């Protein structure tokens, strides 16, 4: 979607969120947004042209492209609820692809003080790397604007 920031039209991801989470972002408690590594979010976050190049690079034993190299360069998220009774625009610090591993969960702990998944990774520890679930972590920077979040 396109939104206006400082008089300029810019691209933004449109994500649905509960109001309580939006309030946590406004209050500085929530610093990362987690989304499933699913077809819906892959279509939203991944640049299809870059992904084709990534697929070719996987066949090369010396290939160095990572899945993160295929992510779109979008700088903002437009959060709202289904009814659009409120909105919150946040600048994106970064987007990364994580796996449900102890190491990746520790990165989220350290970088974002995020602990919602602390007890989840253990159920996947005996799986192969290909079987371990992946997910997106969108690091949140500054709140650009908000409307209707605070009643």
Predicted segments with their positions:
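Structured alpha/beta reader/binder surfaces that contact nucleic acids or chromatin modification marks
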Residues: 2-151
